[in-house]
Amino acid sequence: QGFVAGVNAARKLKGETPFILGREQAYIGTLIDDLVTKGTNEPYRMMTSRSEYRLILRQDNADERLAPIGHELGLVSDETLQKVVGKYDAVRREIKRLEHTGVPSSDALNALLTSRGTAEVHDGSPLIALLRRPQLTYDDLRDFDAGCRAFPPALAESVEIAVKYEGYIRRQMAEVAEFARLEHRAIPEDIDYAKIDGLRLEAREKLAAIRPQNLGQAGRISGVSPADVAALMLYITSKTQD
């Protein structure tokens, strides 16, 4: 947080807008948001479990998330940014290729599948379907496809993670977008927090005592976690649809 404070001190002297990292952008964003909105009575320890967005705050995509921000701050050169952009363009192109490239059934392929404890293929299979299997890795595909053999090993992990966790990542990105849209959504004045499943006891008591007007205020109450806010948001949405 010292780095962020230094950046913002310099930006304030220049009359520029503050540099703020969101919870969905970096763990330091989670740390600062927790300290500012919730406070703490003891040393704060940043653990991955504190972030509700840890699926998208991964080590392998840190450059994709933060290089554009660093470039805006003048800390990342044009050349470095273009390398990062090129890297993830290549990853996306490879995923698209895996979707449209099939591998025929063969004794060698089925022997591999059997040895890994997964079902054989009898009519061939798209490469991406094989990679989605938990038992297989991208490197396993290199023996059956020239394109995979030619693909840079340094990028293979990013392809594998994107493919294997595609559904979970897409769901979390949708949660980020939805929560941003509903952050200022009003909370009914007559809401009964005792009826909301998923709220922890501490959160229920704090919300009932403070009576926040919207979800943004609720999320900034000490003792109310992002999971509590998500439960509250789901409850309000369900009542609106009734």
Language-model-detected regions and their locations in the chain:
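Short amphipathic alpha-helical segments, especially helix-boundary/capping motifs
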Residues: 6-9, 29, 41-45, 179-184, ...
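Alpha-helical scaffold segments in soluble metabolic enzymes
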Residues: 8, 30, 34, 231
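Internal hydrophobic alpha-helix adjacent to the cofactor/substrate pocket in enzyme cavities
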Residues: 1-19
